[in-house]
């Protein structure tokens, strides 16, 4: 965590909070949490993380060795059942599918105003760019941890499981619904 001054975003509050500081997470820790939560949750997809991850990376210079160390520590702390390499592979695959199948766009329409969506004239290309950023984030974490080969192996195994129908394209376990 870090201590930061409160940002004054409204002119009418100018001068009221100039000396106020708060303890908050660093952007590296927030990014690590989002990378873990997006790839490790298998009950629902956190589309908002796909918006936040590129925003965090573009907001300022990120120390990816710190992000990687935090991802590894959080993976252990949260007792994630999948290996770290498999979790990263699932995150990459899931991001690709969510950006490509329109589910990300559909979810973002709930959060973004029509004006913001209209400013992004070619949203498909925008999604491709966002996907590249997210994939690069996972890749940099894997490289920092020295597990890039393991992630690539996990990605190939994941592709095989998807093509054989064992899991969905988003890396989610297929669930059998019991109707009564």
Predicted regions: what they are:
Residues 1-179:
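Structured mid-to-C-terminal alpha-helical surface segments
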């Amino acid at each position: 965590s870090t201590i930061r001054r409160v940002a004054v975003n409204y002119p009418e509050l100018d001068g009221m909070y100039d000396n106020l500081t708060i303890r908050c997470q660093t952007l590296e820790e927030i990014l690590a949490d989002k990378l873990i939560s997006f790839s490790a949750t298998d009950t629902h997809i956190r589309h908002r993380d796909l918006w936040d991850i590129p925003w965090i990376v573009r907001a300022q210079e990120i120390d990816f060795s710190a992000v990687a160390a935090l991802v590894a520590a959080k993976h252990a702390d949260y007792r994630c059942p999948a290996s770290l390499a498999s979790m990263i592979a699932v995150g990459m695959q899931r991001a690709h599918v969510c950006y490509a199948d329109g589910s990300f766009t559909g979810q973002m329409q709930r959060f973004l105003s029509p004006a913001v969506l209209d400013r992004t004239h070619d949203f498909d290309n925008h999604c491709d760019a966002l996907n590249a950023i997210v994939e690069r984030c996972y890749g940099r974490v894997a490289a920092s941890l020295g597990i890039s080969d393991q992630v690539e192996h996990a990605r190939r195994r994941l592709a095989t499981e998807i093509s054989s129908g064992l899991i969905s394209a988003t890396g989610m376990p297929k669930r059998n619904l019991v109707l009564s």
